[in-house]
Amino acid sequence: MSANILVFDSGVGGLSILAAVREQLPSANYCYLFDNARLPYGELDEQELIQGCVTLISQAVIQCQADIVVVACNSASTLILPALRACLKVPVVGVVPAIKPAAALSQKKHLGLLATPGTVNRQYTQDLIDQFASDCRVDRFGSSELVYLAEDKMAQRPVDSEALHRILAPIKASGLDTLILGCTHFPILREELQSYLGEGVHLLDSSNAIAARVVSLLEPSMSGEIGKSQALYTTDSICEGLRKTLAAWGFRSATAFRDSLMPIGS
């Protein structure tokens, strides 16, 4: 049988993770749920984030008959994984900033972490730095605005280059040689980031590591059969430009998640 993989994010950022997983498991069935009604997660109260995500994902696991859940959001992963794993019987894979490989790659031992304010400031992130990059200088840059710029690009709207350069100016001025993209939205802007920061700055994200983890957790019998069905659910309406982009990713239609839920007992 083909695996049913649920990918969850606050917006379209999780598509960067989905792309990496789909490259490894092209025959799986994919269900993508994004909670765009509460975007961006990096600004939410922690308890609201935990309770809301656990409720949504638990419902989606049933709806999609998921064999595995990928929480394709750094802000959520730094908070909700223990609670989510406690209430689900299927494996849960979270996303963490690629601090360990960045520390190994950096020649200057000078890293930057670009993420939402929530991820940048959490103790979980500090623990990763202490564990894997204690010999490095790690500058942290928090931005929720960059999330919206990534959403604009996916909605086929122009990316505000002035805003982008304002956000990136302190990063460029710092002199770092390795930048960790600690939000799954940010690889969407990889071309724009690289263009402004220059080829001397390495950009790292966690997508390939997450894909490898998903493959390792699935039963071997789930990786070979032909499936390839795809379902997309949102918690708020989306614009026509985003619909067109999502169609190019194989999601031909978007369904309001609340409308999709099966009645209890059905």
From Swiss-Prot:
It comes from the Bacteria. The keyword Isomerase applies. Its EC number is 5.1.1.3. Gene3D superfamilies: 3.40.50.1860. The keyword RNA-binding does not apply. GO terms for biological process: cell wall organization; peptidoglycan biosynthetic process; regulation of cell shape. It catalyses: L-glutamate = D-glutamate. Coiled coil: none annotated. Pathway: Cell wall biogenesis; peptidoglycan biosynthesis. The active site is at 73 (proton donor/acceptor), 183 (proton donor/acceptor). Substrate binds at residues 9-10, 41-42, 74-75, 184-185. Keywords: Cell shape, Cell wall biogenesis/degradation, Isomerase, Peptidoglycan synthesis. GO terms for molecular function: glutamate racemase activity. Belongs to the aspartate/glutamate racemases family. PANTHER family: GLUTAMATE RACEMASE. Provides the (R)-glutamate required for cell wall biosynthesis. This is Glutamate racemase. It comes from Shewanella loihica (strain ATCC BAA-1088 / PV-4). The lineage of its organism: Bacteria, Pseudomonadati, Pseudomonadota, Gammaproteobacteria, Alteromonadales. The gene is murI.
